[in-house]
């Protein structure tokens, strides 16, 4: 019987690449969700015939409802944030793949876990903003949390030897360095949205591409790694690997290092999460070592790229510190993409939010949303 998948965020970059994998493996799509892209999700409905579709934007939901009217095979339409949670909770799928962007993914992740579903997680904000809540829920409900980020998938793959995993002493979290690698503050001062959106290796959405340019993406991934693998931040070293071939590595107590390599294509970690624990032939070409010639490794510059420094501060503060950093970044990136602030303002604002409070202590889901709101408000007040 074909594996059934609910895919949250099916029209985005990770969502469409996930459908490439689903198509190649002959999996069944149980449910899809999107925000506004009606035409795109209509094409997906035509091909994959899901039982349920959620449109979180009400106007888009109305347009989709009209487009599906009268069709005998039309999926049941869910709407709004409550519809997204309903979709994540529904019995039927073997795996829920959360590829939503932003803090909106946290509630859906928790709902999927609490409903007993294994969760393939591409929404990094789930762990960044609510890592304590997510890991507690995973332990309570006995489900699997399968990382989809290329770096965390690489680490996860390197730790599959259950005998060696307890001897883990260090994680080497790789970064491409983004389009501005090697540049200093003065050079970055005049960088524009168009400059920042030119990633050297990966094909990603606008928000995550900006995060790669500021190194915020790597800061968020550092926070994720703390929650996923149980090491303190000082045991996680960020290494710039410009070719994006070494996706991350782990070091053990005997100082041996195991790394995962592959072409820079998100369909590799997506497929591993969906086929785990099996490995099967996929849609990505093999790595040609002869063509590589050279692999380079450098230190990440958190003196220049202040988003990375802010994330390190945030995870050391604990509590809602990472949530505050994430909310500030989401708001600052939105303003940058609207040409309302400069490139360096993103790091300035994120660091200012992290420095503004202690953020310690346990928290609830309501606390997460309130912290996110306050961080965004802080950014708007300190332009």
What are these regions (language model features)?
Residues 1-383:
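Catalytic, metal-anchored helix/loop core of enzyme active sites in primary metabolism
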